[in-house]
Amino acid sequence: RGFTMAEFHAIPIPLGAAVVAATSAGFSFSPGRKFELLGVRMSGLTAITGHASNHCAFTVLGSDESTEIWDYSTDSDEDGTTTAKAILYTSDEEAPGGAGDTAKDFETAETKALRTYDANQSCIVKAAKGGSGVSIGDTGVTIIIRYL
C-alpha cells in the first residue's frame, strides 16, 4: 500500500540503511542483495537551486520493473518554514516536471505501493533537469532499505 507523507517520515531508519552524499552529477547505489525499498530521505533541500519547484529525482533502474521516481519538493509555509514532500511516481503515469511547476503540484499526492528489487538493480539520485544552475550540492541523502 502507499504511505501518507506523515507515515513515510515516521518510518524508522533500520540497520543497513545507506547514507550517502549527492552531487549534481548524481550517484549510483547498489546493495548487492535483494532488498525492499522503504524510501529516501533528504536533508538540506534548500540547497537545491535554479528550479522553480526545487525538486530532485530518485530513480530505481531495473530490467523487469517500471522506472520509479521519488520526486522531492520543497514548500514554504506562511511562517517561512521549509518542508519537504516526497511523492513516488511510476513510469506509466505522468510525473510533474519542468521549470513551470511549483511545490503545490505535489501537495496532495501520496506514495504508491513500494516494490521489491533484485540485487542487480541500482538506485540513482540526481538533480532534476530544467532551469539553470540546478544543483543538489552536498545534500545528505538517506536511502532506507530492508534486506530480504
Model segments located where?
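Surface-exposed, low-hydrophobicity beta-strand/loop segments enriched in small/polar/acidic residues
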Residues: 2-148
